């Protein structure tokens, strides 16, 4: 059994208080992906509806529903548990002598949820779309050095940069750079179609979004049959939902509420350091 782990942040409040945001999950639930066992069980988690009516399933937009897109769509490259860049939909990659061109070989036999094949044209479409000024994607900075993506063949792409960049593959681990079917930009916000382990059965940003296991997932069918992502805007209500069994996991719990779960054998508190940081902006034209 693998327990869900989530990110942990520290930030200052009123110059003195440190708030630790902690995620809790039920110990007894199996959430590991496994092709050895049939998909079974329903896992329920919450989101805060932070983008309101603009909440959608398009990973490159400001209103993306993070909890869903990470389960329905894949990237080319990801980080493993040690933080090392590793293959996802790209099997391997290499740069030229001055690191201004990067060639990525793509995984073969991968299909989108609509049954279409994943190929190099989808990669070019998905990533160049991030640069579209009409979309105004918050992720466009990750693609700012890319001037062109050449489709070498059906499962090879060459990305051309405007400068040398030895760590370019690391940029592609950006959680927003997900692969979608070529030409699906107008509908992806509602369908969420990708190559991931779960398929969107029903999208309801203000209610419950239902995901079903993808039996044809390229890493093997997930261990869960369904995931329900429930909108609960109020933080206190999310904690109560966890305590009463309405949800199985809450990604962030204020430090002051951590004591509710300490010593409770039904819950596991996972504190996971990350590279995230929070800045505090201060005026410099007036005295403290």
Language-model features and meaning:
Residues 41-49, 101-104, 123-126, 157-158, ...:
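Short, well-ordered beta-strand elements
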Residues 212-215, 274-288:
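A bilobed periplasmic-binding-protein/Venus flytrap-type ligand-binding module shared by bacterial periplasmic
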Residues 259-271:
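Ligand-binding "clamshell"
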């Amino acid at each position: 059994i693998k327990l869900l782990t989530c990110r942990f942040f520290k930030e200052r409040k009123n110059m003195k208080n440190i708030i630790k945001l902690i995620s809790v999950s039920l110990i007894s639930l199996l959430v590991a992906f496994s092709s050895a066992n049939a998909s079974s069980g329903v896992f329920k988690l919450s989101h805060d509806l932070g983008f309101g009516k603009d909440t959608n399933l398009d990973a490159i937009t400001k209103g993306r529903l993070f909890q869903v897109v990470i389960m329905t769509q894949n990237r080319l490259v990801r980080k493993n548990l040690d933080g090392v860049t590793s293959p996802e939909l790209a099997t391997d990659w290499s740069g030229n002598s001055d690191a201004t061109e990067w060639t990525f070989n793509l995984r073969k036999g991968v299909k989108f949820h609509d049954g279409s094949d994943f190929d190099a044209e989808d990669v070019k479409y998905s990533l160049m779309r991030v640069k579209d000024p009409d979309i105004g994607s918050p992720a466009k900075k990750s693609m700012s050095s890319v001037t062109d993506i050449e489709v070498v063949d059906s499962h090879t792409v060459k990305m051309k940069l405007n400068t040398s960049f030895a760590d370019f593959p690391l940029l592609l681990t950006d959680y927003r750079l997900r692969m979608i079917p070529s030409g699906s930009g107008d509908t992806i916000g509602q369908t969420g179609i990708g190559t991931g382990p779960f398929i969107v059965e029903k999208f309801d940003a203000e209610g419950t979004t239902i995901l079903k296991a993808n039996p044809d997932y390229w890493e093997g069918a997930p261990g869960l049959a369904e995931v329900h992502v429930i909108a609960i805007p109020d933080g206190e209500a999310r904690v109560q939902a966890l305590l009463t069994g309405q949800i199985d996991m809450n990604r962030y719990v204020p430090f002051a509420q951590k004591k509710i779960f300490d010593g409770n054998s039904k819950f596991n508190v996972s504190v996971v350091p990350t590279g995230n940081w929070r800045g505090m902006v201060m005026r410099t034209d007036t005295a403290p």
